Regions:
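Catalytic active-site module of serine/aspartate enzymes centered on a nucleophile-bearing elbow/loop
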Residues: 213-242
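Flexible "cap/lid" subdomain of the alpha/beta-hydrolase fold that forms the substrate-access gate
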Residues: 3-37, 41-213
Length: 242
């Protein structure tokens, strides 16, 4: 999505293709390896890059999303068992096109409601969370970016729609199978930064899978790099300088 070619095939968004793009960049610029950093889905790609191409990753910096243990059950099936079929990961897969259309009809409203901080806690509600965000006329909390910055995202998604970004979720079980033969232990030096107000919980036993990890946190929600840019940059620079 964004300024990419936005391929239509769902499979083009699986972890094999996403990590393959990074390998292609390394090869193009003739780099043996690199330090990779990602946030949320970007962190998922970085973790997977280290699983599939460990020799191409010298260090990792990941924000918000911890390492995900593969477990014994495909991820989507596990999520449906735990959270139900209205959980947005599951909904995207079991009701293809439904959320896509609603988000596409409410681009500005959805993004305005998504990119917020310090929103008051909301109790569980019926229906699908992302659809609620797209339909909510009154945003909660405070914006994490200026109206000018937000307009860039609005223009991008008005151009492409949301299906391409949702296709990342539609490869969840496929990714589980693609990672079946990868060693689950990552030995690269790693910095993991959590937002203390983020709804995504830390992985308690992350050191079982990433033994060479430094775990930090900042007073922020999910959008750490937007909420605490100076503190995060300083934390990263200090870690890289160790």
């Amino acid at each position: 999505y964004g300024e990419s070619s936005c391929p239509k095939e769902v499979i083009k968004y699986d972890i094999e293709h996403l990590t393959g793009d990074l390998v292609a960049l390394l090869d193009h610029y003739q780099y043996k390896d690199a330090i990779f950093m990602g946030h949320d889905w970007g962190a998922n790609v970085v973790w997977s890059m280290a699983l599939l191409y460990p020799e191409r990753v010298s260090k990792m910096i990941n924000l918000s999303l911890p390492y995900q243990d593969r477990g014994e059950k495909p991820w989507l099936d596990f999520m449906e068992d735990v959270f139900g079929e209205e959980y947005y990961f599951v909904h995207f897969n079991k009701q293809p096109g439904v959320a896509d259309a609603i988000l596409d009809e409410n681009v500005e409203q959805f993004l305005r409601n998504l990119y917020r901080k310090n929103a008051p806690s909301q109790g569980p509600s019926e229906g699908m969370e992302m659809i609620h965000l797209a339909k909510a006329t009154k945003p909660l909390g405070e914006p994490i970016m200026s109206a000018e910055d937000l307009s860039v995202y609005i223009a991008a998604f008005n151009k492409t729609g949301f299906t391409s970004s949702i296709n990342w979720y539609r490869n969840l079980n496929r990714n589980w199978h693609l990672l079946a033969t990868a060693s689950p232990i990552l030995h690269q030096p790693t910095l993991m930064v959590y937002g203390e107000k983020d709804l995504i919980p830390p992985l308690p036993n992350i050191t079982d899978f990433v033994p060479n990890i430094d775990i930090k946190s900042l007073d922020a929600g999910h959008w750490i790099q937007e909420e605490r840019p100076e503190e995060l940059n300083q934390m990263i620079l200090e870690w890289l300088g160790k």
